[in-house]
């Protein structure tokens, strides 16, 4: 079993969504309607992507935000999510943060440059690429947006050191690349 499939199985088990583990991983194709879907999303000005970039993919994420108790307080540890389009797993999201294409192995790491709060959910984010690997879907990504977030907030209250909690969340992730010159 491939490492990507093992990861999909682990995330699906964590979410209790066994059907995700059965998703086929054939040739990737970003749907032509992705940009149209994105136009319907209200994006706060603070997390808008700078001019000179074009959206190359809009994917729906289902996963967990994992927190760990350290010195009696909850702190963020890592995300684990499967990003899909029309029910087909295309990208894995994990600690770094990093996003990796399950089809071509390309990846992007990024750092947060802006945040917009969301009631009862993790914030919406604008992240700038800090590195890319390999040609393919994510090989030239310059910016990533996390939009339409639900859930994923840190646990509250007292905790025992070393304890972890994985909190389900969903979001839309928009991937952007520089406009060709």
Model-derived features: where do they sit?
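N-terminal export and membrane-targeting signals
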Residues: 1-18
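Bacterial N-terminal signal peptides
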Residues: 16-26
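C-terminal region of N-terminal signal peptides and the immediate post-cleavage residues
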Residues: 24-40
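Primary mode marks residue(s) on the alpha4-beta5-alpha5 output face of response regulator receiver
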Residues: 35-64, 72-181
